[in-house]
Amino acid sequence: MILQPSALLCLSSLWGVIVQASQGQFPVTQNVTVVEGGTINLTCRVDQNDNTSLQWSNPAQQTLYFDDKKALRDNRIELVRASWHELSISISDVSLSDEGQYTCSLFTMPVKTSKAYLMVLGVPENPHISGFTSPVMEGDTIQLTCKSSGSKPAADIRWFKNDQEITDVQKIQQQDSNGKTFTVTSSLVFQGDRKDDGAVIRCRVDHESLTSTPQIAKQVLEIHYTPTVRILPSTPLPQEGQPLILICESKGKPLPEPVLWTKDGGELPDPERMTVNGRELTISFLNKTDNGTYRCEATNSIGQSSAEYVLIINDVPKPLFPTTIIPLFTSATVKTNVAMSTRTTKSAFITKDPNALPGPVATDHALIGGVVAVVVFVTLCSIILIGRYLARHKGTYLTNEAKGAEDAPDADTAIINAEGSQVNAEEKKEYFI
C-alpha cells in the first residue's frame, strides 16, 4: 500500500503535535535552601496541561496536596496556588527532619514526575570560650578553647586578638548524635605577656546561615607581672643652688606599692631638703654633697624592680667679663661719645680679625674697643683745648716780689704780649696777680 503525499504530510503534522504536547506536559521544579526555623515555598509548573492533576509528596512519599486538596494533616503546610499549570505550597517552621527530595507528579499516561531537593541549614549555637583562669602570671601558658554546636554544614571558627586575626590555631569538628549537625571546636595556645594585659580575645563563628551578623564570644585577658621602673629628672643638667625633682615612674599589675627612695644604698641624708611626695623626690636646694646614686624601688605581689639615677651637680656658669658700667661723662659728652663710639665700632667691625671666635667673646671685644675709642677721643680733645688755651695766654707775668724793680712797668700789673721790640702791638691786656 502506497500512501499519497498528502497523507504523509498529515501524519507528520500529527506526530509533531503529539511530541510538542508531550514536551509541554512535563512538570518543572527547583531545589531550595532554607534556614532551620524558616519558611519555604515549593512550586511545580506545567506549561501545557490538558486538565491533568498535579500532586506534591514529601521524602516519605506522603501526599501533601493533590491539586487544591490537602492530604496530610500538618498545620505547617499551606496551599499557595493551585491551577492546571501550577501547584505551589509553603512549609513554615522548617526543621532538619524536613530535609530531602520532594516530588511533583503530573498524572498523565504514564505519570511524569520532577524532584526538588530541600536543604535545611542548621544554625550554630552561640560560641563559648573556656580554659581561662584569671589572673594569669606573665610567662605562663594560656590555652583557650572555643566551641559551637548545631551547625549544618560544619561552621568555621576564627580567632582575633583585639582587631588582629590569629591563624595559628587547631580546629576539630564532630558530627552530632542526630547525624545531621556538627560540633566545632578550636583551640588557641600562647604565652602570657604583659603587653597582652587588657587585650580582648574574640572567637567568631562564620556560617552561611548567619546572614546578618556573626556569632562572637569574648574573653578579656588579665596578666599579672612585676613592676617596671624608670627615673625622670626635672632638668637634664642640675646646677648648684637650684631645685631638682626626681619622678619615679613605675608600672605593674597589681599596681606597685608606694615607692622607696634611697641614696648610695642608705636613707636620704637630709630630710629637711629632701622630701618624698608619692612617687616624687624633691631636693629644694642642690649642693655638692648631694652628688651620688639615687635609687627608686617599686614592689607588688608578683615581685620587685628598681631604677637608679646618678646625680652630678654642675657649677653655676660665670660671665666672661664684668657687666658693671661706671659713668664717666656728662650727658652732653655722652651723646658725643656715643656717636663716636658708633663710628669707631663700625670701623672695628670692618677691620676685625676674620679668625676671631663668634659669640659673646666677640661682642665683649667690640664693647671694650668702643670704650677705648671714647677714652682716646676725650684725651685728644683735652690736649687740643689745653694747647689753644696756652697759646692765647702767652706773655710776661709779674708777681708781688717784682713790685720794687726799676724796670717793672707797674708793680701791680702784669703785661701780656708786651715785648719791647713790638711796636705795632694791637692790644695789651693787664691782669692783677
Swiss-Prot record:
Alphabetical UniProt keywords: Disulfide bond, Glycoprotein, Immunoglobulin domain, Membrane, Repeat, Signal, Transmembrane, Transmembrane helix
One GO location term (cellular component): membrane
Subcellular location: Membrane
One of the Pfam families matching this protein, by short name: Ig_3
Extracellular side: 25-365
Limits of the Ig-like C2-type domain: 127-217, 227-312
Family statement drawn from the similarity comment of this UniProt entry: Belongs to the nectin family.
Gene for this chain: cadm2
Ig-like V-type domain span: 27-114
Topology with respect to the bilayer: Single-pass type I membrane protein
Cystine connections: C44-C104, C146-C203, C248-C296
Keyword Transmembrane: yes
Signal sequence extent: 1-24
Membrane spanning residue stretches: 366-386
Cytoplasmic side: 387-433
This protein's record includes keyword Disulfide bond: yes
Residues with glycosylation annotation: N31, N41, N51, N287, N291
Protein name per Swiss-Prot or TrEMBL: Cell adhesion molecule 2
